[in-house]
Amino acid sequence: MKLTYIAVLSLIVSLLSPLQLMGAETIEYDVKGLQADAEIRIDHWGVPHIYAQKHYDAFFVQGFNAARDRLWQIDLWRRRGLGELSEVLGPAFVEQDTAARLFLYRGSMFSEWLAYGSDAKRIAQAFTAGINAYVDLIDRQPDLLPLEFKLLGYQPSKWVASDPVRIRSNGLWRNVVTEVRRATIACEHGLQVDAIIKKLEPDWVTTVPLGLDPCDIPKDVLKLYSLSKAPVDFRLAVQFQPPSSKAQSNALPQVDHSRTLALLSDQLIDAGSNNWAVAPGKTNTGRPILANDPHRGHAVPSLRYIAHLVAPGINVIGAGEPGLPGISIGHNETIAFGLTIFSIDQEDLIVYDQRRKGNKYQYRYQDKWVDMKTHVDEIKVKGQKSVSVPLLFTRDGPVIYKNRKQAFAVRAAWLQPGMAPYFGSIEYMRAQNWDEFLAALNRWGAPAENQVYADTQGNIGYKPAGLTPIRTNYDGLLPVPGNGTYKWHGFYDMDQLPAQYNPKNGYVATANAMSLPKDYPYKEKIIGFEWANPWRINRIREVLESSSQHKMSTSIDLQRDYVSLPARRLLTQINISELPSPANALFSQWNYQLGKDSSAATLFEVWMNRHFTPMVIATVTGIDDPSALASLDNLSAIDEFEKFSDANKIQIVSDSILEAILDVEALMGADPMLWQW
């Protein structure tokens, strides 16, 4: 039987409101690539429910429908990830394309597919074939082409099965950025200052690796690294039009990417997530409740894409990403699953001595000069000739920066086989019980995740997952020399990460905070030391432990909970009546809720972030403007504040709150009733 025959794909668009049926429209498409007829039903929320008669047809239709709804978004995602923006947007994007190509997966595709499970390649083939089927449909019906393509003057590309897994730039990467920041602080002020600015957990004191001079790290060493995952700044396409003169056809513009990198910084602000699962014994239904709220920036179109896949062997609904097959957050008929980031340190910045010998670049490794590997990529450029770009690699990874004496490369676990971000969900979303779920997570690579679990039998569980490098003689918190002294000695088996199954307390919960058990041998098996502050997880635990009759509505309320634990901890140590007006009146009546119309919340947040925290850190470190070094940690600030004498506490509070009041008045006027957070 042929697998590629013309079948009918019925698209039923149900125009339902919550109150009444407005009507229904049925559209039929003739699509090559399906094994049997399939159907998409769109509910009143806009969620596609995909019904297929064959297992892999569900993924084909998922790809088709993702293209039908989000073609320009996923086409742009593919071009950005593969380094093909210049072909359609012009010469201003050559450097960003170069950066993206440095971080493509370039290893064995056999090993890559095998790492995800037995049918990963087949799923990717079906999904990308579905996307291509919609692109073919546009060729036959040009009126279906999304407006963005028309405005920018190009056509959507065809996909190959390897595209979604070769792209690694859509993950939430870890910790090269903080390594460089820490090196800068160590150079200018000493590591003792960094320990105050950001707490390390579990309790840890880092040291400068032998042979590293922190002052050798260039300020812009991470430009290509950051560009590789930066969003697309379309202003550059307008600003740098392809030259009209043939004599200039090979000239590339000098592009300032500061705005592009600022867009990336905006995306990463306050990134974080929460999840929890409550056991039947603590709910009012006698069944487990699982909740997950990933905190990613609002965007149009959205990062997430909700879908429901039904076919033999699969019935799963939830959220994934439009350019990937499967569901990463959701449930099937027997299990539910949700994720947050778990801070495994999966990166190192490697510093080499380097030289040029003839037409080769070399780096020093174990007292020998070793040739860098060179890949020459051809980047197509709109309106110009293609550009040949040499990409350099060491034994550790791609070279992102070099000067006359040194070269800098990134060693990253997520460049290993099986590490395409979120692609591993195709395995665990089909699990039917805890053991199958664990088995799937033991193959999960990136990004490192806290997974919570619940099933229809009443079980709950928690399992972190991600590829964890084995570091035996360093902690990964600073760049390291590339001379062979600081190596990874493979990776830990996934089952060595801690797990919980039906814990006695009746719930599991995570919020990006440090979640290693107290008896975990963190000094011998280093996972990472950089976690989110514990405010969110402490609030979640507080609520979940306060009742044995947890409801669905309790989880919904907790996802929208605005109680500020920093405010409660700090203000209970202060004599509020002695604060200047209007702080005394606002704080004395405040319930610590960060409501958008709360004048007290407005004043507190401006005070805490702009004045109190910088003033405390400046007092402890002696640095006039510590906020210029890094994002300051309010947990560290409160910890340090609590060590002050009573007189110093009064002085800090008095000075900083007065500055905050003036700041808010300048922003929103003198009437506190008009202050809004």
Question: Which residues does each PLM region occupy?
Answer:
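Short active-site loop/helix that positions an aromatic residue
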Residues: 296-309, 422, 431, 435-444
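Hydrophobic alpha-helical segments
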Residues: 347, 401, 406, 446-547, ...
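Substrate-recognition/specificity elements adjacent to catalytic centers across diverse enzyme folds
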Residues: 25-289, 294, 318, 627
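Bacterial N-terminal signal peptides
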Residues: 6-18
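Ordered core of a single globular domain
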Residues: 187-193, 199, 203, 246, ...
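Second-shell loop/turn segments in exported
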Residues: 58-62, 107-122, 411, 422-428, ...
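Compact, glycine/acidic-enriched structural inserts
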Residues: 315-316, 320-386, 426-430
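Sec/Tat signal peptide C-region and signal peptidase I cleavage site
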Residues: 19-23
